Amino acid sequence: MATIKEIKELLVTVKELESPIFLELEKDNRSGVQKEISKRKRAIQAELDENLRLESMLSYEKELYKQGLTLIVGIDEVGRGPLAGPVVAAAVILPKNCKIKGLNDSKKIPKKKHLEIFQAVQDQALSIGIGIIDNQVIDQVNIYEATKLAMQEAISQLSPQPEHLLIDAMKLDLPISQTSIIKGDANSLSIAAASIVAKVTRDELMKEYDQQFPGYDFATNAGYGTAKHLEGLTKLGVTPIHRTSFEPVKSLVLGKKES
């Protein structure tokens, strides 16, 4: 009779719920064996569910594949709302029918998985572009226009250039066909890939800024207006990376000028 360890090793090779190996092993009454069978079945079901989820997130891409297009770029940004730091956009072209396990809207990915999935996108993407627009430009042109500039910069870095743009809820003034998708980072794998690239890139930048400007907790809050960030603003004032067109930074700058 096989040991439970041997059965566990055998079950790792089973990829289908209908496998005859399950039928054979279910005759074994040992609780340890039944536990391993249940565990493996749950793992297979989870893989099937994940594959279906990824498949559903390729619906926009598949429509474009039918039209003969393959160089499809997903575009997304991170950093519209913070009081400090740049807005970062990423543009990612994935291979046809590419499925990266765990890839999703970056806001839905556990933080501990960010770097792993970011690396998987880096490894599998045909091309990646990153656009970074700093706080000074944001203050000059407004955050909406700065976001478009970041996206255009990211697209300009791609090689080869894309045949179609999938963009999260925006339209760009570019001579390339495009589709604007509401909640695109949750509905398109290409946009989700751009979402995680932009997120990790910006988070790493804000960690560097945390070293340059301690006291604002940038490494944790990424420039968003948390209690610690606002406390830092009150105690230490405005840094060169703060957006002076955003409140309460704007009022702090005006108050300093008036005094």
From Swiss-Prot:
GO terms for biological process: DNA replication, removal of RNA primer; mismatch repair. InterPro entries: RNase_HII, RNase_HII/HIII, RNase_HII/HIII_dom, RNaseH-like_sf, RNaseH_sf. The keyword rRNA-binding does not apply. Its cofactor is Mn(2+); Mg(2+). One of its GO terms (cellular component) is ribonuclease H2 complex. The keyword tRNA processing does not apply. Keywords: Cytoplasm, Endonuclease, Hydrolase, Manganese, Metal-binding, Nuclease. It holds the Pfam family RNase_HII. GO terms for molecular function: manganese ion binding; RNA binding; RNA-DNA hybrid ribonuclease activity. Endonuclease that specifically degrades the RNA of RNA-DNA hybrids. Belongs to the RNase HII family. This is Ribonuclease HII. The gene is rnhB.
